[in-house]
Amino acid sequence: MSQLSVNAIRFLGIDAIEKSKSGHPGVVMGAAPMAYDLFTKQLRINPEEPNWINRDRFVLSAGHGSMLLYALLHLSGFKDVSMEEIKNFRQWGSKTPGHPEFGHTAGVDATTGPLGQGISTATGFAQAERFLAAKYNREGYPIFDHYTYVICGDGDLMEGVSAEAASYAGLQKLDKLVVLYDSNDINLDGETKDSFTEDVRARYEAYGWHTALVEDGTDLAAIDAAINEAKASGKPSLIEVKTVIGYGSPNKQGTNAVHGAPLGAEEAEATRKALGWDYAPFEIPEEVYADYRQNVAERGAAAYDAWKQLVEDYKQAHPELAEEVAAIIAGQDPVEIKLEDFPVLENGFSQATRNSSQDALNAAAKVLPTFLGGSADLAHSNMTYIKEDGLQDDAHRLNRNIQFGVREFAMGTILNGMALHGGLRVYGGTFFVFSDYVKAAVRLSALQGLPVTYVFTHDSIAVGEDGPTHEPIEHLAGLRAIPNLTVLRPADARETQAAWYLALKSQSTPTALVLTRQNLTVEEGTDFDKVAKGAYVVYETGADFDTILLASGSEVNLAVAAAKALAAEGAKIRVVSVPSTELFDAQDAAYKEEILPNAVRRRVAIEMAASQPWYKYVGLDGAVVGIDQFGASAPAGKVLEEYGFTVEHVAEVVKNLK
C-alpha cells in the first residue's frame, strides 16, 4: 500500500509538470518516500482546519519542488488543491503556482523558492512555538506543542542564510525543528562534487545539531525511525536522506537532466513502466486516497478535536490566560495597543529618532505581552532593547530580547517565521546601510503579507566619520520599490511614535522604520494622527503660498528652517513632511490636491538619499536636494555642508526655481 501511495505523489508531479511543460520533477520523484512518511506518520495537520494554530508546520524549503507539496495536499484532502488545480499547475489564477505561496493556497505554511530561506523561516516557527509554549502552557495543558519539519536540498544548504539560521538554531537549542535533507548529489548545473563537497552533517554537529544518515531514501522504516530519534534528541535535527533525483526514470534518474525540466512524454511513459504505475495521467486509485484519508486527515482531525477539548478545559482552569489565547487563536493581538500607551511629547523636545523609537518600543512592550524582537548585534545602537526583559535563550524562554548575532539575513527570515506562526508581534534592527543584507527577507515579508517591523537606524550621511560604507544612499529608493512594504522615515519623536503605532496596527504589511542617530527637534507642526496619511503640512506662511518644500525624516527640520529663512525675505512657502511615500500615494486625489496643489509648480524635495523617488512629486518644474553619489568620512556637520544640506543651499535652490 505504501509504495502505491508514494508513487501517487511521483506521478501527480510527473503528470502536472508534463501538462504545464514546466517544473522540477526530479525532487518530487526522489523525495516522495520521505514526504509520504512525514505526512502519514509524523505531521499533525487537519485539512479541514488548515490554519489550526497548534498544527505541525511543514516548510518545503526546496520550493522549486512545489508539486511534491501540492500532491500531498491534494491526496490529504485539502480542498484548495483539487485535481483540477493539479492539472492547472503553474497556470494563471491557479492555486498551484510555480513555487508555494503562503496565503494563496491553504496548507502552504510559508512562501518558498529563494533557496535557504525556508530553513531559516522554519527556525522562526520553532522559536515562536517555544515562546508561546513558555508563555501560555501550564501543567497538563500543552496548548502550544508542535513540531516544525523541513524538506531541503543541497542548494538550500549552500546558501549562506541557511548557515546563519542553523548556527542560531543550534545556539538556541530549538529541539522541535527537524530538517530532512534530500541529499541526491545533483544540482542544476551538474554534480555537487563540482560545487559542494563539505561534510554537511559534521558542520551541523558543530552548530549543535543532532544529525543522522538514512542511506536509502526509499526505506520508509529507516526514515521514520530517524525522525523519531531526532524528536527525542533535545536538539534541532538534520537528517540526511540519500536519494536518487528523478527516481524511476530509466534514462534520466541520477542526472541534472531531471532537475528543472519535464521528463518528456516518452520518458514519462517509460517511468510508468519502470515503477509499475498502471494508471492514466492524473488517475489515482481509491485505495491511495483512503490511505491518506486515514493516516493524514482522520489522524489530524482526531488530534485537532482533542486539542479543542484541551482549550475548553484550559478556559476553566486558567481563565485570564485563556482570554489571551483565544485572541491568538482568532488571529488577533492578545492586547490592543492604544494611543494613550505612548508618552506625551512637547514641542521643542530634541532626541534622535532611534531613541524615540526605543521609548515607543518599550511603551508598547509594557502593553503587548507577545511583542518581542532584537537586533543583529546592534541592540544598543539601534535602541531595540526591551528594558524590562533579559535575553531569550533555551534557559530563559520567556524573555523578549533576541540576540540574533551578526546574521542580518537570518534575522529577517526568522522574524518571517515567527510572524507566519501567528500570535506574535516581532521586530528586528540593524544599521540602515545593512538593510541590503536583509532585503531578500523583507521582500518575502511583503510578498507573504507579514506585519514584521524592521528598525533601520543610522539612516544617512549624518553618520559622518564612519564614511561611505556606512552611509545609506540608494537604500530608501530600493525599499520604496518593494510592493506592500510601508517605509516610514519620521521627522521627530512625535512622528516616530505614530510610525510605531501604525506598524503595530498593521495586519498584512511589513514596516521599515528609518531612523536617525542625530538629535531632531519636535516641530510644532508635526501631528501623530496625520502620519497615517503619509504626507501633511507642517508649516506654511499663509494660504497664498507659491512654493512647496517636501522632506522626510531629519530633513524636515532643515526644510522648516529654510522656509522660515525664506519667509523672512518675503517668500510665500509651505513645508510638507513626507514620512511615507507609500501611505501618501494611497490617499485619494482630493487629499493629494489639498497637500500638493497642481497649481503650485515650484517644488523642492529634500532628502539625504538618492533623488529618484522624488521626481514624481516635484515634476519637471521642481528640484531635488538629494545625493546621487556615495558619502564621505568626516564629522557629520562637514559632510552635510559639503553635500548641500544647509539652510543656505536649500534657500538658493528655491530662489533658482522658475
Name what the model sees in each region.
Residues 1-32, 151-152, 156-157, 178, ...:
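Conserved acidic/glycine
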Residues 20, 56-57, 108-111, 141-159, ...:
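A short, small-residue-rich loop immediately preceding and capping a beta-strand
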Residues 30-172, 385-386, 414, 418, ...:
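Cofactor-binding active-site loop characterized by glycine-rich and histidine/acidic residues
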Residues 91-103, 127, 131-134, 140-145, ...:
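Thiamine diphosphate
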Residues 470-473:
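Flexible, small-/acidic-enriched active-site or ligand-binding loops
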